[in-house]
Amino acid sequence: MSGHSKWHNIQAKKGKTDAKRGKIFTKIGKELMVAVKNGGPSPETNNRLRDIIAKAKAANMPNDTITRSIKKASGELGSVNYENIIYEGYGPSGVAVIVETLTDNKNRSAGNVRSAFTKGGGNMGTQGCVGFMFQEKGEMVIEKADKDEDEMMMLALDAGAEDFNADEDEVFVVTTTPEDFGTVREALEAEGIEFLEADVKMIPDTYTAIDEADAKKFQKMLDLLEDDEDVQEVYHNAEFPEGWEE
């Protein structure tokens, strides 16, 4: 079945910041705390917390770090309140960009996000200006290695997956509805499947090709956003030039 994640194309542009393991753990730690605040500290009764714990483990986050984040959100180790704010806007060539933040200072985050858009040749827009161009989907990325494609596809679809993409060179990409994400992930985990990445995210309906000049500008924007302490996720619909390397 064909998919539309273009996972490899996008991940190649994120590798520079994703290699900073400490930043990743900080971002996931914030998500854990917000999930606990909203639904309680027990993963048995808090589906969102269970999903984020799985995401943390896929990122090789140590168990004691996960536990510490949960305790902090429960008030056992003090507490910090984060506000979830979504920013939308445009990059070079009209690329659609959604920036998800968790912040304890919305004035700081708004200023930093706006600055990143400007420095990257884009502009921050109003709420909803590009959101309609994306769909919220669950996505699990699995290393192909020696796995049988047909067997993997049947496992995913039987578990309730919406789509299975084997077009990428090195990975399978399983797509679900947000509601079915946890169920499908747990079913695949029960079969011994491990994930390179597993999360609910915003996936664009279509992609916008950009040339090398705009790719350089846009990469600058992505680096600024992804290095910002308040930014959790950056979603976009840019298709970088073939063979593009930062």
Swiss-Prot record:
Annotated keywords: Cytoplasm, DNA-binding, Transcription, Transcription regulation
InterPro entries: Integrase-like_N (IPR017856), TACO1_YebC-like_2nd/3rd_dom (IPR048300), TACO1_YebC_N (IPR049083), Transcrip_reg_TACO1-like (IPR002876), Transcrip_reg_TACO1-like_dom3 (IPR026564), YebC-like (IPR029072)
Family note: Belongs to the TACO1 family.
GO cellular component, one term: cytosol
Species of the source: Clostridium botulinum (strain Eklund 17B / Type B)
UniProt-recorded name of the protein: Probable transcriptional regulatory protein CLL_A1008
Main location: cytoplasm
Annotated compartments: Cytoplasm
Gene Ontology MF annotations: DNA binding
Domain of life of the source: Bacteria
Gene Ontology BP terms: regulation of DNA-templated transcription
